[in-house]
From Swiss-Prot:
Keywords: Lyase, Organic radical. This is Trans-4-hydroxy-L-proline dehydratase. Its EC number is 4.2.1.172. The gene is pflD. Requires the activating protein PflE to generate the key active site glycyl radical on Gly-765 that is involved in catalysis. Belongs to the glycyl radical enzyme (GRE) family. HYPD subfamily. It comes from Clostridioides difficile.
Amino acid sequence: MARGTFERTKKLREESINAEPHISIERAVLMTEAYKKYEGSVEIPVLRALSFKHYIENRTLSINDGELIVGEKGDSPNGAPTYPEICCHTMEDLEVMHNRDIINFSVSEEARKIHKEEIIPFWKKRQTRDKIINAMTPEWLAAYEAGMFTEFMEQRAPGHTVCGDTIYKKGFLDLKKDIEARLKELDFLNDLDAYNKKADLEAMAIACDAMVILGKRYAEKARQMAEEETDEAKKKDLLLIAETCDVVPAHKPETYHQAIQMYWFVHIGVTTELNIWDAFTPGRLDQHLNPFYERDVENGILDRDRAQELLECLWVKFNNQPAPPKVGITLKESSTYTDFANINTGGINPDGQDGVNEVSYIILDVMDEMKLIQPSSNVQISKKTPQKFLKRACEISRKGWGQPAFYNTEAIVQELMEAGKTIEDARLGGTSGCVETGCFGKEAYVLTGYMNIPKILELTLNNGYDPISKKQIGIETGDPRNFQSYEELFEAFKKQLHYMIDIKIEGNAVIENICAKHMPCPLMSTIVDDCIEKGKDYQRGGARYNTRYIQGVGIGTITDSLTAIKYNVFDKKKFDMDTLLKALDANFEGYEAILNLVSNKTPKYGNDDDYADEIMQEIFNAYYNEVTGRPTVCGGEYRVDMLPTTCHIYFGEIMGASPNGRLCAKPVSEGISPEKGGDTNGPTAVIKSCAKMDHIKTGGTLLNQRFAPSVVQGEKGLDNMANLVRAYFNMDGHHIQFNVFDKNVLLEAQKNPQDYKDLIVRVAGYSDHFNNLSRTLQDEIIGRTEQTF
């Protein structure tokens, strides 16, 4: 059955989900032309801006039949541009993208020819990917290749940020005036950075020009199409598009329709300027749109149906944009088409009052009706949120496709204030990507990569030696067979952790400098607060707040592993360290009795058992203390968050067996969720265990829970879901999300994938088509503990 409330959006949705993801070579060609023309003659920020402007002036424009919101990243829906200045793919990369079984991108023969003859020769030695790898120390490279951590900027650009309200108050002509005024104020006598500021500001002004051109070109194209159109209804739509593009993005929006189109033009601009990770995000969309909605309804030019239709059109636009193609380790850490555009709904308003409004409910209806993996939608639940809103969100969630996710507004505000933000800015913040918090429109909060915490224990148990890569990756902290206490083991673990965090942050500092020098983003700098005022590009610390995150992975696995060692080796003395190490080396073959002890007769995290939960707290605090507060190149600080995307699969693949009974190469635990099968006391025990982590010290945590459909059916099931969310959030939990499915359905989908093309599940901080997941990830989701109330 076609989904969509209106015939228009039913058609657009079907076209979107059936469009083949493909490589769009056009951006690479136009950027190459611009670099050949301008490189060496202007400062790099201006080079970036002129290249972006050249791209905007010459790129293909797409207005798809029936749509009301216009703009694509590629040449057509599901076209993925490439970014050779950041990552110049090899011909082998293109072959892999074209032929791999999942997350594949069609690459035409023409695109391959152009890439081989024009793109690779120019960009091979210019790409930042090579600059980064070549600048890394042998220790960093060894740790990276061993899977101790990942690096987001290896194929993507920093730029994880969220849209604030600037674009709804000012058009790009207004922003250009602000930039020109700031240029006149530069003090070259007393400000040693004035020359760099001049280049940054001039680049921002050029980026504003480019955005004005983008709107003008779309207005002209829509009018041209209207002149040729014989269908009166379609002609009317095209003229409306033209009138809308006459206003935005050059000027501030005046209507609900214009506000949506304004955001979308900015989204397309920011995500084609650089392939930022994660994609640019609307943030508090209901808060931004509601004033336009109320005014238009009052003026009689908008009703609820039309407002929903326009948002359904926007949902299709998000779904038309696959994440930039990835290869190698970067694909393993985020194996999905989704680019993590995340919409926050609900929460509180700037005055601290309930933020739920009519647009909030419209957004819930849109996500329910459209059922698309992009955008990823969440609800912020505060103590002031109406129960009606929470239950409507739960009603959608229990349908089984993983949206919306649930976030604790009070926790988000406290997390941001803990990190030094003002309460006014914190109230306007929220979550993006998977679960990460930030002050929307005011903060550059860049994810730098995942940290494999269980593998740090693996190094500790092998005196710094990695049994998988057969290399000395860590430092020598002693033979664990000689440790006389659990405390001695944990001290050794903390030393390995300190060493690995040092390596990671040392590399990050180099990468930040490379990106600031070679990959400024003048367009994004125009819309992030304080960049214009400071005269500094986003990449140089122009934003009001500059945060860097290192995401911890596998807290459930390492908690149960250290618990197993403390309980069985040191406290109960059921076996010694030497026997355990031999069992791990043998993948427990021949050591089934030990496997049974650690798997079934040892305290586990996720059961409200203080024995295990206190160890979780120790591990978390060690990680927090190592990372949080370290300075960044841009004048901000490092923080931690706890999420995996799909990295828990990769991290497990490059590990041997773990002391908790996890077998060699099997996934480690995801988010802050307990190890699969370890949580046996129900969902209330799970949230009690998870709440013992101090979420307020983080920038986000991710908790998955799984139910069978029968458990959450009816009014009682709905109340149980809502009450679980409220209970967890009353304990300061950050986030919870639900998978609701029949295990047998997923097993059948593995056997007959052609019959389950529309099956969607929750993976980590996002939902995805079951058929787009690797078999290992499918098995991991199927194996998650099925909870009952």
